[in-house]
């Protein structure tokens, strides 16, 4: 009985903790941020509570470079607006005419045309678009059914080799544990 009365006295002496409240929890980072930082997520049908000053907070900018480039437009050296289809067509025309013209040179040395970059087209492109600089343009690579079958075969062989290696590793580790337990028993 004496112990319980002592406990009651200790409970009465301890005031309630100030951190226990019904307000929205805030993460305070005084070193980095000037204001308390919270993440507000609203879901369909849910009511999200937030402070009035949080309504005016700016959302962070998109860090993904593709999203930032979506609104940009390409211009020619004359200042005309280029559409993406015109640019793609021009590049395709440049690469196809230059590779056909240089095909006789590459066939004499028996080098595959698709693997050789066209330097003439890059200089021609640099004349059309000075900001592009010297670039190496390559022909587009066509994937055939045979390429897919060969790749699937290589993947299957690699998986089989990996399975064999994992089984060998498992057996070796089991042998080590058995040897270790035998040495401990001796």
Swiss-Prot record:
Location of the region described as Transcription repressor in the Swiss-Prot/TrEMBL record: 1-104
Major localization listed first in the record, in broad terms: nucleus
Subcellular location: Nucleus
Biological processes per GO annotation: negative regulation of transcription by RNA polymerase II
A single cellular component GO annotation: nucleus
Alphabetized UniProt keyword annotations: Nucleus, Repressor, Transcription, Transcription regulation
Record bears the keyword Repressor: yes
Signal peptide (residue range): none
Domain of life: Eukaryota
Keyword Transcription regulation among record annotations: yes
Tissue: Highly expressed in testis. Not detected in the other tissues tested.
Known role: Transcriptional repressor.
Family membership noted in the UniProt record: Belongs to the MBD3L family.
Protein's recorded name: Methyl-CpG-binding domain protein 3-like 1
Record gene name: Mbd3l1
